[in-house]
Amino acid sequence: MTETQNTSRRPGALIAMSGGVDSSVAAWLMQRDGFDCTGVTMRLTRNEAVNTEGLHTCCSERDIEDAAEVAYAMDIPYEVLDFTADFQEKIIDKFIRVYEAGGTPNPCIDCNRYMKFDHLLRWAEAHGLDHVVTGHYARVEQDEATGRWLLKKGLDENKDQSYVLYNLTQEQLAHVRLPLGSLHKSEVRAIAEQQHFVNARKHDSQDICFVPDGDYARFMEDFTGKHYPAGDFLDVGGRKVGTHSGAVRYTIGQRKGLGLAMGAPVYVCAKDMQANTVTVGPESELFDTIVYANEVNWIAIPELKGPLRVTARTRYHQTEQPATVYPAGPDSFRLEFDQPQRAPTPGQAVVLYQGDVVLGGGTITQVAKG
């Protein structure tokens, strides 16, 4: 290819189309800006394995139809890629392992990490496409001083999705485009209406795609063929106060559905998976100051060399809280919040910020009162 031919080539973009309004508008924005777009939807589950009828999930057969219709309206190539085997291995199997070990996993973060920004980037490269584009509400920018790629919050605070993207690496960020990061949801829907997209008024997906009804314990039993046995509810003093229906069915901080009459509200405070016990207590028992994390990914800095003031989230929609982060060995850190936080939970992500910039994050391994 000559230099003239190379510079005249329009950049190519793989659009990860979920069938929702956000990724559809992301595709339209990239096409408007001069990119040669190819729409791709990942098939992650089989119809017979997951019943999504009437539920707001993603990547269902209905979503594939919607994505294909938008791609047709835009006159762009469109493909469905079958990732069901890898999705089961990397997402579903891990989801079950973490729950069975007593944690609370976040499969949407793992899906971004292993599927969207790994498999799709490799597919894009193999097909000569320069970028992978998604409909996430976050921003990617390059720091002129350091040359590092930065992940920033989306301007729409109510839709910001930077928390679920903290695992993006420098190599990935260099090829990722997030055109909705500077828009508000209302603007996105307005564009979809103007373009007469079939999904302009479609509800956002709200649940885990392979557990759309939210009953993850039933899904796990159906998927594995196991039965999770009943066990003892204990109070914080170790005394039996009732019988639960299987420790995997409960999450830290849960109040509803316990079936206990103890004269005052009680919450799930701890689980012992080997003993199959669930400890309940007053809400005050849920608050912890120290969080330990591993599987760390740094974005704004190459590594953590010493204590650093940050703000942090231990849940998706939590307002960031002030804290200090300390190195704690290879691929790990210790985070000390200024004030105790409610129910930080092993298995969930803890994401660190400085202003609107994502510093990095990791997976919570344990918590402590401090």
Regions found by a protein language model. Give the residues of each.
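AMP-forming adenylation/ATP pyrophosphatase catalytic core
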Residues: 21, 133-370
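ATP-dependent adenylation/nucleotidyltransferase module used to activate substrates
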Residues: 1-166, 177, 186-187
